[in-house]
Amino acid sequence: MLYNRIEKDWTRKEWVLIIIYTVISFQFYLYAGFNNTIIKLPVFLTIPIMFVFCWKTFINHTNNKLFQLMKWIIISTVISIFSAYVFWGQSIILGYRAIATGLTLVFYFYLYKRKPSINSLETYIFIFGILYCVLWLYAMSKFPVPVFGFNEDGEVKEDISRGMIRINFIGRISLIFAYFLSLNKYYVQKKKVYLVIAILFFLFIVMQVTRQLILWTALVTVIYVFQKNRKLLYLSIVFVISLFLLGKTITFSQDSVIGTMITLTEEQMSNNQQGNEDIRVTEYRYFFTEWSRNIITDIIGNGLPHGSSSYGKYLTKLQEQQKLYLSDVGYGQIFVVTGWMGLFLYLMLFIKCCLIRMPEELMYAKMFMIFLLFANIAASWHAKADCQIAMCISVYLMTIYALPQLKHKKITLF
């Protein structure tokens, strides 16, 4: 790879600091042995420290559009804290505590300042992808004793409603990012070891029994693998559709993973056919049309509610009485928190990253951003720390290594 040799490998000290920063951002994987409140305190401290360290880089004037978009997303997020104070009476401190995880994006400016080598970044991606698998297996071995993952009430709960033990905690996006990296490396280097790793990562993704993550990961995989052969691409799409249709005629045990997930999907489709609006459509309509108090909050956002404030209790009441959840609608949450300004910035970032030209060796960064563009429709993945760090790495790689756009070239994803 012929890249500008401005990048350097992380030193041992930097590796220690970056791993600590990541684990803190992940809130120690919400380990059940720690107090739910205490594990959040380091996050509130490390974000400002990272911000101060990167301040000169943050205010640096550059014409790079990706850099500018990341900067303005951070600015719009900070503005939303004050919006919640002015229009909802939520204190600045509670506003910051509610949205601190959303400021993990400042990691991008550390990367831009330090310019670590691609080798360091890819090693980092593999480390946290593998670490999630190890922790997940450990949590499985301890079932039914809960190990990782607090719910919104500060309690740990495993779900067995989908045909197998469903243990989900922060780090799933790190797993998906590592999968895309493995897949990309296999198709570039043709080393079977990366194919084996990619298959293992995908099996772990399936074992998360989260339909949307499986769907969008598989879709991006199909597009990437068959991008150069349109016939195979179309056949693959037809195969996926046929598999979905056959799912209604093939009988699976209701206790099996496949049977349970098909049943859940069919129940949702049945509700739609009976005239019952899909819950996420209802949520999107509500949060886009009924949440904001005035035109100003429509533009700059309302900020993120904290459970201890009256603003947060308003959201809790909505969840309990109408079963409408802000975390269910990624773009709805972006609009509520940062308004039309933030929504425009995020969409511009996602779309630009999906259309940008990248070297074949770094295509995993683009694969992840395409995945995120679609996955964020039905969940607020963009606001999760693991997703934000993966975003930072992907956008950083695109900022530094993007190829020049070709004139009169047909637009393609890969």
Regions found by a protein language model. Name each.
Residues 1-264, 320-413:
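Hydrophobic transmembrane helix bundles of membrane-integrated enzymes that assemble
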Residues 274-338:
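Long extracytoplasmic/lumenal interhelical loops at the membrane interface
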Residues 155-162, 172, 266-280, 295:
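Luminal/periplasmic active-site loops of membrane-embedded glycosylation enzymes
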